[in-house]
Curated annotation (Swiss-Prot):
Organism: Ligilactobacillus salivarius (strain UCC118) (Lactobacillus salivarius)
Phylogenetic classification of the source organism: Bacteria, Bacillati, Bacillota, Bacilli, Lactobacillales
Keyword flag Translocase: yes
Name under which the protein is recorded: Energy-coupling factor transporter ATP-binding protein EcfA2
GO cellular component: ATP-binding cassette (ABC) transporter complex
Subunit structure: Forms a stable energy-coupling factor (ECF) transporter complex composed of 2 membrane-embedded substrate-binding proteins (S component), 2 ATP-binding proteins (A component) and 2 transmembrane proteins (T component).
Length: 289
């Protein structure tokens, strides 16, 4: 399921004193099966762009196409039902959307709503609960008896129960402690690989961009100012500094180390294991001298 935006523009509250242009000529291409990170400061247009991905917002001008579904300013809401089944959204604090008596019923709600029988919906719910590592014994409990991390997994399982092809993550680890954040990001990465889900992640965490994404889009004042791989983006620290973006911790450490040792020909590490390999190469070279 590829996603293409062509000269996408969006303006809030047109014709009022509060009129605000949120997106300006945005053209992007997100490939099927990719893990795309969208980064930028507050007010850059990230959330506005996300809301175009399943028709929560429709362009003021331009268009966005998702697996053959094209949305423009003439698209009727009744035409968006199938698309919304294929694009699952995980907003910040998705556990706020829980409402059913039991975990199982909450996860099964979406497939039942899309026409599955009760037995079919329950089967899907149990499968998705396993995918997000929810133990069997919690399925008959109230979701409100669970820990915050488990409640979030219930909400995500409910989104997966729609069987989307694209999973859109808007700061999905907000409010979690470091261990919970790591577990959640590893879970999304596993879903990306094992379920062949296209992932679109909005984040301020450059470490997550480096660790998980294969494609990164940078927005600033409603415009796309970079569209590249993480390695390309993080290879220009001066550009990042000028746009008030940080390096991942591993890459930042590598730059400082290479500067200290007056080295410039080593490949850029994004992940901790890549940094370890580079350090071993350096040590090996020094030992051979």
């Amino acid at each position: 399921m590829s996603i293409q935006a062509k000269k996408l523009n969006y303006t809030y509250q047109i014709g009022t004193p509060l009129e605000h242009i949120a997106l300006k000529d945005v053209s992007i291409n997100i490939k099927d099966g990719s893990y795309t990170a969208i980064v930028g400061h507050t007010g850059s247009g990230k959330s506005t762009l996300l809301q175009h991905l399943n028709g929560l917002l429709k362009p003021t001008s331009g268009e966005i196409s998702i697996n053959g579904y094209t949305i423009d300013n003439t698209t009727k809401n009744k035409e968006l039902g199938k698309l919304r089944k294929e694009v699952g959204f995980v907003f910040q604090f998705p556990e706020a959307q829980l409402f059913e008596e039991t975990v199982l019923k909450d996860i099964a709600f979406a497939p039942k709503n899309f026409g599955k029988s009760e037995d079919e919906a329950e089967k899907i719910a149990r499968e998705k609960a396993k995918l997000v590592a929810l133990p069997e014994e919690v399925l008959e409990k109230s979701p409100f008896e669970l820990s915050g991390g488990q409640m979030r997994r219930v909400a995500i399982a409910g989104i997966l129960a729609m069987e989307p092809k694209v999973l859109v993550l808007d700061e999905p680890t907000a409010g979690l402690d470091p261990e919970g954040r790591h577990q959640m990001m590893e879970m999304f990465n596993r879903l990306h690989k094992d379920e062949n889900l296209t992932i679109i992640l909005v984040t301020h965490q450059m470490n997550d961009v480096a660790e998980y994404a294969d494609h990164v889009i940078v927005l600033e004042s409603g415009k796309v100012i970079a569209d590249s791989t993480p390695k390309e983006l993080f290879s220009d620290p001066e550009w990042l500094k000028n746009h008030h973006l940080n390096l991942p911790q591993t890459t930042d450490f590598a730059y400082k180390l290479f500067d200290k040792l007056a080295l410039s020909k080593h490949s850029l590490p994004l992940k901790s294991e890549e940094l370890t390999d580079e350090i071993l190469k350096i040590l090996g070279g020094n030992l051979n001298e």
